[in-house]
């Protein structure tokens, strides 16, 4: 998958061109009859989206996601509340615009010529390619030429339908496919890994995130080159909403907010390791249930799943782990660090986890307050790995090379330079294995994404099984619900205590239509 980046140049060019076209609509505040005035009079910005790990999701009842966060900030920018409507597929999103039920579509939608004929695009903010996926171990097609409608299914409203039609007309006359009117791309990817479907097509970012939980999903081939992603609004003579979006994105670009949000949601990297991910998820099943109580007990200010990811990166959850350099235990502490923390046995899992958390908290306390709250943990983890003094050097080097020392996106790019003599020779604390610190933090982020998604998949499976049980035995009395007669209850009880988070929604769940007020 190609590297993702916010298309700042495209935003700038688009802003310049549209500013001229939209000049009669600027300033857009204060006009009596326009879309912005209607939104402000209503007191809410109506945004339709789809439920995916990237666009919109909930953890512990709190919404998050790249498109959600941008939409929330845009609503704040306009001085109104955000009303989010979650749809099942892309086709339903555009129905909302057509029926006047949404002001904006914020759902990772690709900019293409067919869509802009009928809808107004906004600035682009990252890019994706469309890819054909299959299940590992099944036949991998090397071309689209021989695929049939029995093999290939795509989601309704998917942008790739236009590309498939063009390929059929120009290159692959035998190519055929079908459109599932009810399922979105995430559901179709689930069908592929469950063996219900041979192939489907999804965007590269969605696939990358899906693979963190389902490593058996594999990419067969690219269907398109990179395509810009944008928001859409109604296309008519009123350009006030478009003008407001341009102003908003330009402001976000200039003050660095856009880059920070990109790093938050897209900064986990796009390199997927099938073996490593599969090994990690097997450890989640086999080892994590025994360690979870300790992670929950000592996590304190950080998410216990992040703490678990840190411990896995350190030792693969092996309390007896020892490195050639002498660091030992679950959190791989040095002898001196362990002594300073009062740890008497580094191979005792509880002592190691407790000490590791305290050491990490010490690193967190040293991170300057100028660093945004949601990025402080990454600075602290890099310091945990290579020492805080070298983190100071990394921030200083970032400032010297015209980057932002308070931005993790900028600082992490300079970390590998700490091992290069032209750079470390001029730094206060000298040489450091900055490339290792970079990989260390990136790996932890990937493990955290996999863990959160996988645990929520377990919750979904348990919930669906419980619902099926209720349907199968609607009139069973409590006295009949013995574990011998209904062994699933034993599994459900164990799952609830060993695996499940208490999040009411699922990172990779199948969602229908719902509305959220923010």
Curated annotation (Swiss-Prot):
Enzyme class label: lyase
Signal peptide: 1-21
Cited PROSITE patterns: TRANSGLYCOSYLASE
The keyword Transcription belongs to this UniProt entry's keyword annotation: no
Reaction catalysis annotation: Exolytic cleavage of the (1->4)-beta-glycosidic linkage between N-acetylmuramic acid (MurNAc) and N-acetylglucosamine (GlcNAc) residues in peptidoglycan, from either the reducing or the non-reducing ends of the peptidoglycan chains, with concomitant formation of a 1,6-anhydrobond in the MurNAc residue
Predominant location category: membrane
Membrane topology: Peripheral membrane protein
Region named Non-LT domain: 22-269
GO terms for MF: peptidoglycan lytic transglycosylase activity
LT domain, as annotated region: 270-518
One GO BP: cell wall macromolecule catabolic process
SMART domains in the cross-refs: PBPb (SM00062)
Matching Gene3D superfamilies: 1.10.530.10, Periplasmic binding protein-like II
CC annotations in GO: cell outer membrane
Keywords: Cell outer membrane, Cell wall biogenesis/degradation, Lyase, Membrane, Signal
EC number: 4.2.2.n1
Domain notes: The N-terminal domain does not have lytic activity and probably modulates enzymatic activity. The C-terminal domain is the catalytic active domain.
Similarity annotation: In the N-terminal section; belongs to the bacterial solute-binding protein 3 family.
Role according to the record: Murein-degrading enzyme that degrades murein glycan strands and insoluble, high-molecular weight murein sacculi, with the concomitant formation of a 1,6-anhydromuramoyl product. Lytic transglycosylases (LTs) play an integral role in the metabolism of the peptidoglycan (PG) sacculus. Their lytic action creates space within the PG sacculus to allow for its expansion as well as for the insertion of various structures such as secretion systems and flagella.
Protein name stated in the entry: Membrane-bound lytic murein transglycosylase F
Species of the source: Escherichia coli O157:H7
